[in-house]
């Protein structure tokens, strides 16, 4: 009887562990995200890892095709002590594309700043790059390394630049006093796809 009880206890413990582990995995992909991409794609995403970068790359593939005249901002919030436990939220800031890529970006950035309750301080002086500069120079100025930090990332699919269409990351770091610092990272389109 004691042996049977011990076996049952062990099986129960294993089951509890499995349930607990699967619960933790699911928390990496909130229901809003799973509903948006579908369970099959969400499961496939798990094989890519649970890093912010994997989620961001995947989101480009999912949302990029529909981001025509609007910028879809997908926010992943987390911190180093709860790595991977990211809350999913979506913020859409309307922005009409125009022929001037710089003013288009500047206008959309201003709208993002207002929507998030800015002003922000930024690693890139947006006003320091003139509209006359070619896009390559502008993009080079915006290219920053996120340093692997997993605090909060805002991203949008850049549309309206023809063959230069790419992804611009805005890494948003909230501070205790309510202000924020923004890092901008330009990611070429070919690097923004899932392998």
Regions found by a protein language model. Name each.
Residues 22-24:
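Bacterial signal peptide processing site
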Residues 94, 129-195:
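An acidic-aromatic pocket/loop used at catalytic or ligand-binding sites
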Residues 1-7, 11:
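Positively charged n-region of N-terminal signal peptides that target proteins for export
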Residues 35-39:
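A glycine-biased structural micro-motif
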Residues 27-34, 96-99:
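Short, recurring structural edge motifs at helix starts
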């Amino acid at each position: 009887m004691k042996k049977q009880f011990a076996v049952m206890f062990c099986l129960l413990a294993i089951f509890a562990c499995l349930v607990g582990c699967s619960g933790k995995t699911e928390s990496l992909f909130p229901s809003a995200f799973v509903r948006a991409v579908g369970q099959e794609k969400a499961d496939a995403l798990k094989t890519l890892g649970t890093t912010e970068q994997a989620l961001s790359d995947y989101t480009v593939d999912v949302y990029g095709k529909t981001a025509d005249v609007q910028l879809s901002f997908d926010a992943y919030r987390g911190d180093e002590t709860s790595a991977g436990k990211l809350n999913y939220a979506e913020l859409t800031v309307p922005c009409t594309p125009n022929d001037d890529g710089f003013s288009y970006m500047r206008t959309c950035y201003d709208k993002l700043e207002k929507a998030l309750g800015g002003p922000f301080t930024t690693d890139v002086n947006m006003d320091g790059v003139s509209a006359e500069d070619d896009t390559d120079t502008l993009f080079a100025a915006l290219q920053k390394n996120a340093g692997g930090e997993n605090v909060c990332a805002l991203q949008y699919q850049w549309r309206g630049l023809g063959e230069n269409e790419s992804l611009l990351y805005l890494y948003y770091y909230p501070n205790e006093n309510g202000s924020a610092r923004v890092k901008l990272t330009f990611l070429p389109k070919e690097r923004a796809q899932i392998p």
